[in-house]
Curated annotation (Swiss-Prot):
GO biological process: endoplasmic reticulum unfolded protein response; IRE1-mediated unfolded protein response
Species annotation: Caenorhabditis elegans
Binding site for [2Fe-2S] cluster: C43, C48, C51, C73
Keywords recorded for this protein, A-Z: 2Fe-2S, Iron, Iron-sulfur, Metal-binding, NAD, Oxidoreductase
Domain 2Fe-2S ferredoxin-type as annotated: residue spans: 4-91
Protein name: Probable aldehyde oxidase gad-3
Record bears the keyword Lipid biosynthesis: no
Consequences of knocking out this gene: RNAi-mediated knockdown reduces both the longevity-extending effects and generation of reactive oxygen species when exposed to 1 microM N1-methylnicotinamide.
EC number: 1.2.3.1
């Protein structure tokens, strides 16, 4: 009789689970059954790495445990039978922190902390197998872990400190000179001799102290009896040997290892009953045999095991290319778990996509052993398997590779990005004395290029055009790339890449303060890195329901019918809720415009939909998987209406969300200024949108209380705004609603309006059902529902003199607002207010048009219109430079608006170090010398080009108006401990840590005697949204005001008690001295001689960026970055440098790999999954990354300990410099090839766009 259970171990504790649902993932089991919530859910697609855990198995051949990192969000629980599961909680805790966690926590290697457990686990898997890893091994281990906050540098630096290679963070430093940070730079840099951290002081890593492999798993005697697992929809059989498999497979509708099959099945909402059989535990399918002549790899083995076997068993020149190919093909987490068989079958089934492994298996002339339905074994060539679709009637048992293969293997994979991406085209060639095989993949099945193989010997003598003609392939562009690279390979077979030196530098001026100004690690780092930090979806509520979101599938239509009957039939579904269930206002954003811009977004669609992804209603169910399934069963019928999805068509149709906004001079005055100029230039710019890609998706938990009370736990950037939104929606006074935010897993502007809508939906359901209600968006739903950065189309006409000095400019900008207002009018306004950037442009006019389209309603995103203005102006400056024959940097410099001068709307420029930053950066980066070197490089390089560019930023702080204030509440307990609460939310920017340091400095109390509690409306209310880079400034002023008031009461008592704090507090209590207070913080502009609409001070900076592009593939890489910023006297240099680096990488992504497009016909977002939207990876971090804080103290009294805000300014600078640097690369190629037409700002400069611009038409 079959068994019904599985046995495994989690963090040292044995677990027996009976009748596991085959559809249950390891992540949901760990989080919801075992309460191990350090395993985060960021995408549930195996893309982001936040859910990474480690699986250990005992290898009898090696007599040791082998560990591998996997995506717990994909792994079915039944796959962990006889496995040691290790989560971040099992690695270490705050009481006994692991060295990996310790170095990352104290090394400032996290910001919001949501992705951090995943990085720890990826590193832990590597170190468990290789205690002395190389830098290349570390890079490979974390290459599929995504981080949106840090810019990766501190993560890499912390992990590189474990490297066995000399040089630590400078691994690859072949001089033996040690770490760049151990060298004092005081001689050349005048006092910038501090380093954020030296890992030399940390304890050495001791692998013998790791948790041991559980003896229970080693001695466990697994029965030969097959296991049967019965879930709600699936009965799964797990046979143990091939005879059992043959016996039972006839009765099973699905044959699979179970990984991808489970992933696909859970996305099928229908009720069904299926019988599966898994190859996972079939002995013969898990065997590896290495003979003298062949290598046999079992069908149930994972991709990495297959690759490792081939790498070690085939000739070195073939093996090393297989290893390199697999790293580009897949993430470690996927390769460590997905079977090579699944990849082969998926490729063989597809008539459209390109299969990487099929290409590899074809070029290696692999043979497959197949099992037919009669139980007979047969052997076929891989080509025959794919061509005859034998997967429909046969099961793969193993693959056989000949060990007699000789020569060199060459593989090329082309996608949107250079690694771990879907493939558009691939090419593989095996070239040797005996065997020459070449295959190409371009949609559908691999094609053998036999006609090209006969030309191998003559490769050096044939031109690429000649070779292309022999391929009989229509895709000339990709074939040309492949053959060019192949030709290079043939001529340099023995060449190996040198490890590049790594140069990470962070300079700041140290301060002698006890707290403020010191690079102290964020107090919550240890909590996050050990999995102990809770985010909204980690909070556990009794008897809760979860929401599944019913979304529009058409861009514009009337809703004629909503049928929820099939969804409500599912057991565990509590109900459907839509617009008729809203007790108050369905458009609450129109009623609370005093805290935000008026927003006509509906909570639920009312009679019509205006975008794909608009929320029509929600399903409430007992668990989130069921809720999402049920939501997909809701049938919505539409009467479709004309739609405007395409942005340019909407502009032509004059479809607007609001009034046209005009700033600057009268149109006639600008026209006159241009007519009087020596020359007028004009151009057009197109700037794409950007997704926030916070790792924690939108999350809310609303708990109903007595009466009308609601406790709203929400991942929001504005607790008071969310409170008012919920109050207006629920028709409940705000004082009965408490909104609490502990921390956000990233925000970037995307968790203001968006977060509040989700909270309102949860509140409606919680009140109706009187049950706690979770609203936790899947990544796909988050991408579909929420807004992005505004796409912009702009035109300009600029008048200049013969030197390139701007005398007047007229901007027109159209912003894609989407289907509702959201923040579109605000972003348009900020573009208009700040369009002069860092320049004095004479007579200026800006006309802004917020455009309505039937697409996502776009919203705030880091920079809030400023990055778009920056990119427009980069194009303007390049255009002028080209026309007058000067460098773009010269044109920028002569057009700077200087301190003491005025912005174009009349505000005076106060406390500004723009020129100092620019000149320092130019010298520090050796800009002019490197320009000469790049010129020589480009002269000698045909396809690969380099460029260098500088950009700068000026960002006025704090902002004028009601948003430019902070609020804080301070109370002192009788034991002397201090509790602080502020109106700003912590979302990775280090706001809470800075406020602790400010409070510590002001009270002269040790920082560990102060705690900062949740941002909550019952402690501080009416607080502005957190954003705009000003919250340390404004909330810092509020904290100082609280401390000043408290100390004015306490100081006489403290003096009387000779400074004894605890005794003084008790005495003050007895004397009825108030030990708590709440204060606002704002800059009294008149007091400092600053106008009401002027900025009291400016955060400024400059950067130089050197880029490289491959004009054939379109791929780019950052060679070196030099950033110089003035943030006054930094409150915490580590946090500020972290913000600078993170903003730089986010800005790099904006102008390179991050793309937002919509299907013109269906209105659907093309990048509608985590895998389709590309954010920068750790491999994109420049190897030479230098940041310097000037530390200029010209404080005017309006600053908190002479500091200035940070957050957004580096992003504007980054996107400008990266874009211009790439354009310099492109211009060089175009000039060399006789193409002289000017290319205005186009963003993003994706691989496809670079290829397009670097091609002869």
């Amino acid at each position: 009789m079959p068994l019904t259970g599985i046995f495994f171990n989690v963090n040292g504790k044995d677990v027996n689970e009976e009748n596991v649902d085959p559809e249950l993932t390891l992540a949901y089991y760990l989080r919801n059954k075992l309460g191990l919530r350090g395993t985060k859910l960021g995408c549930e697609e195996g893309v982001c790495g936040s859910c990474t855990v480690v699986l250990g198995t005992w290898d009898d051949c090696q007599n040791k445990a082998v560990y591998r990192a996997v995506n717990a969000c994909l792994v079915p629980l039944f796959h962990v039978h006889k496995t040691f599961v290790i989560t971040v909680e099992g690695v270490g805790s705050r009481d006994k922190i692991h060295p990996i966690q310790d170095r990352m926590a104290r090394g400032h290697a996290l910001q919001c902390g949501f992705c951090s457990p995943g990085f720890v686990m990826s590193a832990y898997a590597l170190f468990s197998n290789q205690p002395n890893p190389t830098i290349q091994q570390i890079n490979a281990a974390i290459r599929a872990n995504l981080c949106r906050c840090t810019g990766y540098r501190p993560i890499l630096e912390a992990l590189y400190s474990f490297s066995s290679e000399s040089g630590g963070c400078c691994g690859g430093n072949k001089t033996g000179g040690g770490c760049c940070k151990d060298k004092s730079s005081s001689d050349e840099d005048g006092g910038y001799d501090e380093k954020l951290l030296s890992f030399n002081d940390f304890p050495k890593y001791d692998p013998t102290q790791e948790i041991i492999f559980p003896p229970s798993l080693r001695v466990f005697s697994d029965s030969e009896t097959p296991v049967t697992l019965k879930g709600d929809r699936i009965e799964l059989l797990l046979p143990k040997n091939i005879d059992q498999f043959k016996k039972f497979k006839k009765d099973r509708t699905v044959i699979s290892s179970g990984l991808i099959t489970r992933f696909v099945s859970t996305r099928n909402p229908k009720e069904f009953s299926q019988k599966w059989i898994s190859t996972k535990y079939v002995k013969e399918f898990n065997e590896i045999t290495v003979n003298k002549d062949s290598v046999v790899v079992g069908a149930a083995l994972n991709i990495q095991k297959m690759a490792d076997t081939l790498t070690s068993s085939l000739s070195i020149n073939i093996g090393k290319e297989i290893d390199s190919f697999i790293q580009k093909f897949s993430s470690p987490q996927i390769a460590n778990f997905a079977t090579w068989t699944g990849a082969i079958i998926s490729g063989a089934k597809s008539s459209l996509s390109v299969s990487d492994l099929l290409i590899l298996f074809n070029v290696l002339d692999a043979k497959l052993t197949l099992l037919n339905n009669s139980g007979e074994l047969t052997q076929v060539a891989i080509e025959e398997f794919a061509e005859k679709k034998l997967f429909a009637t046969h099961t793969i048992v193993n693959a056989i590779f000949s060990r007699s293969l000789t020569g060199f293997l060459f593989c090329l994979k082309l996608g949107e990005t250079s690694e771990q991406d879907s493939t558009n085209f691939n090419f593989a060639a095996l070239v040797g004395n005996q065997v020459s095989r070449i295959f190409v993949g371009l949609g559908g099945q691999p094609k053998r290029l036999t006609s090209l193989e006969v030309h191998i010997d003559a490769l050096k003598g044939l031109s690429v055009s000649d070779l292309c003609q022999t391929t009989e392939m229509s895709d000339y562009k990709n074939v040309k790339i492949a053959l060019t690279r192949f030709s290079d390979f043939m001529n340099h077979k023995e060449k190996t890449e040198e490890i590049e030196g790594i140069n990470y530098l962070q300079y700041f001026k140290p301060k002698t303060n006890e707290s403020a100004g010191r690079p102290i690690a964020n107090y919550f780092n240890e909590r996050a890195i050990t999995g102990e930090a809770f985010y909204v979806n980690d909070i556990q509520a009794y008897n809760a329901v979860h929401l599944g979101f019913v979304l529009s599938t058409v861009p514009h239509a009337e809703i004629t019918k909503i049928d929820v009957s099939e969804a409500l039939q599912l057991e565990g579904v509590a109900g459907y809720f839509g617009v008729s269930d809203v007790p108050g206002n369905n458009t609450p954003g129109l009623q609370i415009s005093n805290m935000n811009f008026p927003d006509d977004t509906t909570i639920f669609a009312d009679k019509k939909v205006e975008s794909v992804g608009q929320v029509i209603g929600v399903i409430a169910a007992n668990d989130v998987v069921l809720a999402r399934r049920a939501a997909k069963l809701v049938k919505v019928e539409y009467k479709e209406l004309p739609s405007l999805v395409n942005f340019k068509e909407a502009i032509e149709a004059k479809s607007l969300l609001g009034d046209v906004q005009h700033f600057g001079k009268d149109e006639n005055l600008v026209k006159e200024s241009l007519e009087n100029s020596s020359k007028v230039l004009e151009g057009e710019c197109d700037i794409g949108g950007q997704e926030h890609y916070y790792l924690e998706t939108q999350s809310s938990l609303v708990i109903p209380g007595e009466g009308d009370e609601l406790i709203v736990n929400c991942s929001t950037q504005g607790t008071s705004f969310t409170q008012l939104m919920v109050a207006e929606t629920m028709k409940i006074p705000a004082h009965k609603i408490i909104v609490k935010t502990k921390r956000l897993g990233g925000g970037f502007g995307g968790k203001v309006n968006n977060a509040s809508w989700i909270a309102c939906m949860c509140a409606i359901v919680a009140k109706k059902l009187n049950r706690p209600t979770y609203g936790f968006l899947s990544r796909a739903d988050d991408l579909a529902i929420t807004g992005k950065r505004h796409e912009v189309h702009a035109k300009y006409r600029v008048g200049i003199n013969f030197d390139g000095k701007i005398e007047g400019i007229h901007y027109q900008a159209w912003l894609n607002g989407g289907w509702s207002k959201d923040h579109s009018e605000g972003v348009t306004m900020v573009m208009g207010l700040m369009v002069d950037d860092v320049y004095n442009m004479g007579t200026i006019r800006f006309d802004g048009y917020p455009v309505k389209t039937n697409s996502n309603s776009n919203t705030a995103l880091r920079g809030y219109g400023n990055p778009q203005s920056k990119l427009i102006n980069e194009g303007v400056m390049r255009r002028i430079a080209r026309d007058v024959g000067k460098s773009t940097e010269e044109i920028k410099r002569i057009n700077f608006a200087l301190e003491g001068g005025r912005r174009y709307l009349g505000g005076k420029i106060h406390n500004d170090a723009l020129v100092e930053c620019w000149e320092y950066c130019k010298k520090w980066s050796e800009f002019e010398n490197r320009q000469s070197g790049i010129k020589q490089f480009n002269k000698n390089s045909t396809a690969v080009k380099r460029g260098i560019a500088m950009s700068s930023v000026r960002f006025g702080l704090p902002h004028p108006g009601p948003t430019g204030h902070g609020i804080a509440s301070l109370l002192i307990n009788l034991d002397g401990s201090v509790q602080l609460s502020i109106g700003g939310t912590e979302m990775g920017q280090g706001l809470n840590q800075k406020m602790l340091q400010v409070c510590s400095e002001a009270l002269k109390r040790p920082i560990d005697t102060i705690t900062i509690v949740d941002c909550s409306t019952d402690k501080v209310t009416n607080a502005p949204e957190t954003g705009g880079s000003q919250n340390a400034d404004t909330n810092g002023l509020a904290v100082l005001a609280c401390c000043k008031k408290i100390m004015s009461r306490l100081q006489p008592i403290i003096d009387k008690n000779d400074g004894e704090w605890e005794k003084s507090i008790r005495e003050a209590y007895g004397a009825y001295v108030p030990l708590q207070c709440t204060e606002y913080g704002t800059v009294e502009r008149a007091k400092f001689g600053v106008g009401e609409m002027e900025s009291p001070y400016n955060t400024t900076g400059a950067c130089a960026v050197e880029m490289e592009i491959d004009t054939l593939t379109g791929y780019n890489r950052v060679i070196r970055v030099d950033i110089v910023m003035d943030v006054g006297e930094s409150l915490n240099p580590a946090l500020d440098i972290g913000q600078i680096e993170g903003a730089f990488i986010q800005g790099y992504g904006l102008v390179t790999c991050e793309k937002i497009t919509f299907n013109k016909t269906t209105g659907q977002l093309d990048q509608n999954t985590a895998g389709k939207y590309k954010i920068p990876k750790a491999s994109d971090v420049p190897k030479d990354f230098r940041v310097k804080l000037l530390g200029i103290n010209n404080a005017n009294g309006a600053q908190v300990y002479s500091s200035k805000g940070i957050g957004e300014p580096p992003l504007m600078m980054s996107c400008g410099a990266v874009h211009s640097s790439i354009m310099n690369c492109i211009d060089n190629w175009r000039n060399e090839n006789g193409i002289h037409e000017f290319v205005d700002t186009i963003s993003p400069l994706s691989a496809e766009k670079i290829q397009e611009l670097c091609s002869k038409k």
